[in-house]
Amino acid sequence: MLFVKAITVILLILSIYGVTLGLFFAISVRTVTLFPIAQSYSWQIIPLANNGGSDNFEITSWHDHHNMRGWIAFNISSVPQNVWIQSATLRLRLWQKTTNQNDLGDPTGRIYAVYMLTQPWSGTRVNWVNQPSWTDYHSASSPVPPGQGGWNGPLIWMDWDLTKIVSDWNSGVPNYGVVVKDTEENATLLYSTQFFTFHQTPNESYFPRLMITYLNPLGVYAALAVVFTETVLFSLFWMRSQSTKHDAN
């Protein structure tokens, strides 16, 4: 009988701990979805052309100066400083890709990388000649997914894990955005992928996005403090009950 009571008390205590931690984590964990503040791409063969404001964002690999790169920036000021970044995902909605014919190739499976920019730029002025520099530190890569998108679907997204890059920005590294490019430029066939932008598209379902999930450490510390307090109170209650039993005997 005493064993059953002890197990019941232990389970009750663990349940209270679980509810406490669950509530605090629910309060402390947040996910925000951010849309771009600037976006553009440029074609190497027309080095002074700017494509800011275009409805597409094109990444291309082909020889004889036909590569294309794209730049995109997000304002992450809505994410508090000194929080723990749990995940950050860049998502681009696929529009269309080249297919295998003549000098064209299907880019499915090709690796596109995202690099952190180290210089400021403007979506309405950036081109191949004045493109900002970048670093491969904490870069992210992803294979081009299969299938064709289109204005009416299906919905096909290409994702990159930018957790480390966003953590750097949140820690004070200047946020100039990122560049997206094929990791093997100057291909013998023309491999090209077009994504939708936040310009000239019907609604936010087409927009590129940066999805950030973060944890506020203050909530964690508060949860630990409450659990510690609960433990002390449980201990005092247990000792008092044991003392009462002893006095009764």
What role is predicted for each listed range?
Residues 1-31:
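Hydrophobic secretory-pathway targeting helix
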Residues 20-21, 228-242:
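Alpha-helical transmembrane segments
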Residues 24-58:
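N-terminal leader/pro-regions and domain N-caps
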Residues 35-38, 163, 167-224:
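Proprotein-processing/basic-patch segments
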Residues 41, 47-48, 97-174:
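Beta-strand-rich interaction/scaffold domains
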Residues 44-99:
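A short beta-strand-loop element at or near the start of a globular domain
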Residues 71-75, 84-95, 115, 157-165, ...:
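Residues within well-ordered beta-strands of beta-sheet-rich folds
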Residues 243-249:
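Cytoplasmic C-terminal tails of single-pass
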